[in-house]
Amino acid sequence: MSPALSPLLFINILLFLPFHHTASAAAPAIPVNGTCRNTCGTISVNFPFGTDFGCGHPDFSRYIKCSSGTLEFSTGTGIYTISSIDYPSSTITIADPFMSTCSSMQNSGSFRLDKASPFTITENNLFVLLGCSTTSPVFDQYVDLCDTGSGSRVCRGMYSCKGVTGIGLQQNAPATTCCVYESPTGLSSGYALDLPKLQCSSYTSIYDFGGNEGDPMKWKFGISLQYNDSYSTENCKNCEDSGGYCGFTGVDESFACICRNGLHTSNNCFGRGFAWSGTWRTKFQTRMSSAGFLLLWTMLFI
């Protein structure tokens, strides 16, 4: 190699190496999300829900996830098991492990829906407060918080259960400490059932009597929630038609179609072998690396 070219070679190498490093650093790892699935245990999981963060719609992912084969719903008052999802009616049913039923009653915690959540209580829910103090605000004669009509039959039915001994009452005790609660805030997002404030030992929720109003052992206990079903888009439909999962990515939580190989696209998975958010940079890096070696080889033999 000519001595006169040594400085030129040295300058070119110095100029090239930082550029090569920058190109390499700019290429992010291909985003892979292998956790999106269309089932969790025995429950089908469709949009807007997802099995993990990045799956489904971001407004729902902070409330619902799949954990060890169990689909869970989270609020500020706890984590609840989702027992069913009915997509045609846009409802989910959740089970509170501390909620009383006819067969088993116990002291319960409170229940609250987050105000910003896309969920509301369905109108067919009956919240029943059990073992309430005689000084409970639900018995305020100036505020109608208890259904004293058909609610009285529900209270008598609950107190006829053997499980009532779990909250310190005798079977068939007077239903004067029971209240079918009618929340003053209605059933919207932000619904709250604060048992300490209401001075009640336990609660239950009945979402279906199953045609057996006189037999509390056959009542369906749980909390039925209506969800906002207006999140579906044409992009999501195209994604699902191509076998992908609708999800989101990035700080702005923009739409992403997550293919079954774990890669993301901006629309669908037809013929997609690379992630739209990283492929071009990877190819660019490879080409620049090849060009750099060619430049170095040429200059060494000049």
For each feature predicted by the language model, list its residue ranges.
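Extracellular/lumenal glycoprotein segments
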Residues: 3-302
